[in-house]
C-alpha cells in the first residue's frame, strides 16, 4: 500500500478501519510521519483466530480441541473392532430357547398369523360416537 496516496483512519465505536484517498497533497507537505503514525496507532477489529486462546504453546495442546478432537473421534469409531453377531446374542439365547408359538397355534394357523384388529373396543367407540353425529 502506498503510504503517500492513502492513509488509514479510525472511524466509529467498533474500531473499523477506513482507507481514504483525499487530501493527498496536504499530507505530502506534512510528511510521511503523520500518516505512518495513524497507521500504527489505529486499532484493528478483533478478528477471531483459530487457536489464539492457547497462546504460543505446544502443538499437542492445540490438537486436544476443535477439529482434531472431532477427527480423532471419527477415526476411533472407524477403527473399532466389529463384534460378532453371535457374541452380542449370547445373553439372549436362554430367553430365545423358551420362546414358542404353541399357545397361539392352538387357535389355528390363520388366526395366529393375522390377529384381528377388533377386540371389542371398536364397538364401544362406535356406540360412543354415533349419538354425537
Curated annotation (Swiss-Prot):
TM region positions: none
Effect of residue 26 to A: Slight loss of RRE-binding
Motif (Nuclear export signal): 89-102
GO aspect biological process, one term: mRNA transport
Region named Disordered: 22-66, 104-133
Record field: compositional bias (Basic and acidic residues): 22-31
Protein name: Protein Rev
Species for this entry: Caprine arthritis encephalitis virus (strain Cork) (CAEV-Co)
Amino acid at each position: 500500500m502506498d503510504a503517500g496516496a492513502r492513509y488509514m483512519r479510525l472511524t466509529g465505536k467498533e474500531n473499523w478501519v477506513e482507507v481514504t484517498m483525499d487530501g493527498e497533497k496536504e499530507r505530502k507537505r506534512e510528511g510521511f510521519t503523520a500518516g505512518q503514525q495513524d497507521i500504527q496507532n489505529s486499532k484493528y477489529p478483533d478478528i477471531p483466530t483459530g487457536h489464539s486462546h492457547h497462546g504460543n504453546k505446544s502443538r499437542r495442546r492445540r490438537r486436544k480441541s476443535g477439529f482434531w478432537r472431532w477427527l480423532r473421534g471419527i477415526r476411533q469409531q472407524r477403527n473399532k473392532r466389529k463384534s460378532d453377531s453371535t457374541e452380542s446374542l449370547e445373553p439372549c439365547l436362554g430367553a430365545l430357547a423358551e420362546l414358542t408359538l404353541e399357545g397361539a397355534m392352538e387357535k389355528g394357523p390363520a388366526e395366529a398369523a393375522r390377529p384381528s384388529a377388533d377386540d371389542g373396543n371398536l364397538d364401544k367407540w362406535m356406540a360412543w360416537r354415533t349419538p354425537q353425529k
